Regions:
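Membrane-anchoring hydrophobic helices of lipid-metabolizing enzymes
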Residues: 1-109, 145, 152
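Juxtamembrane/interfacial segments around transmembrane helices
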Residues: 72-73, 111-113, 258-262
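Short, flexible loop segments at the rims of nucleotide/cofactor-binding pockets, characterized by
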Residues: 81-88, 133, 152-157, 194-196, ...
Length: 285
């Protein structure tokens, strides 16, 4: 299976990006699904910006989304040494190192660049317990799960058992990680504002914090626009007194901050606004 992913990503990241950019040009010219959905989402998120800005962002976003797919293939087929070399620098690492051993640490992320590459880097530093949405093809799902666990971390599917494992890990003072920007399953979220729209949002991270008082640190991969080099950035450390509340709204605001660092790095092709408090069934049609 590793050979299969290697054959799909035979070049270095730098050379692979050239190939990805060519594919992006074709996708944009054909106005493919990834382009259409990205345009809808960007028009919602940045409605206050002019059309020229939004169209430019759509094109750059599609290019970087396709690059992120290549990064994932690269991550699934290369040695740890090669993967470590793919990250230019880490900003605010001290936030990660200040883990509270009594209550653990919650790493909040979003689908910025390759989630697999990010998970690889943070699990290479420490044992992590994380959850993920399973891949429909069973053979691929098993390979990806094992690859995410190769550094000794624990990865579980997004279900009742996975949630239980996150709570258990925090109670043992461990680190847990979750990308919290996707639409959750029925009865697993609340409607909260995200880029000006009340959308269905997971309340798992607020629940984890409420029950364990674990501090929350955001983390994501970003790209440098001048050099194309990748770097990891840890955001603000969110700690709250017992009477304070970390809500889904607070979480969405933090995710917006991650995205706004470099909006083209975000995977805008996901239908994030499909489930809104004010229902709109035509939004992606």
């Amino acid at each position: 299976m590793r050979l299969f992913f290697y054959l799909l990503s035979p070049f270095s990241l730098r050379l692979g990006y050239v190939f990805c950019d060519f594919i992006a040009l074709i996708a944009i010219a054909l106005n493919t699904k990834i382009v259409k959905i990205s345009r809808i989402n960007i028009n919602i998120a940045y409605s206050s910006k002019n059309r020229e800005f939004r169209e430019s962002l759509v094109k750059r976003s599609v290019k970087h989304s396709i690059r992120s797919y290549y990064e994932t293939l690269f991550c699934l087929s290369r040695s740890q040494k090669k993967l470590n070399q793919s990250i230019f620098k880490v900003e605010n690492r001290f936030l990660y190192s200040q883990t509270n051993k009594d209550s653990g640490l919650i790493l909040l992320s979003a689908h910025n660049r390759s989630v697999d590459l990010l998970l690889n880097q943070i699990t290479n530093q420490n044992d992590i317990t994380a959850i993920f949405k399973p891949i429909k093809i069973k053979a691929f799902n098993e390979f990806v799960r094992k690859n995410r666990q190769k550094t000794g971390s624990n990865v579980f599917e997004t279900n009742f058992r996975g949630v239980k494992e996150l709570f258990s890990a925090l109670k043992r003072g461990k680190v847990v990680a979750m990308a919290a920007d996707q639409v959750p399953a029925k009865n697993m979220g609340v409607y909260e504002e995200f880029f000006g729209r009340k959308v269905y949002t997971t309340n798992l991270i607020p629940s984890l914090h409420s029950k364990t008082k674990a501090p929350i640190v955001s983390v994501a991969i970003h790209s440098d626009n001048l050099t194309n080099q990748l770097y990891i950035r840890y955001g603000c450390k969110s700690t709250f007194q017992e009477k304070s509340q970390y809500s889904a709204k607070t979480m969405n605001q933090e995710i917006e901050k991650i995205i706004n660092i470099n909006p083209e790095d975000y995977n805008w092709e996901y239908k994030r606004f499909k489930k809104q408090e004010v229902e709109d069934n035509t939004i992606y049609k």
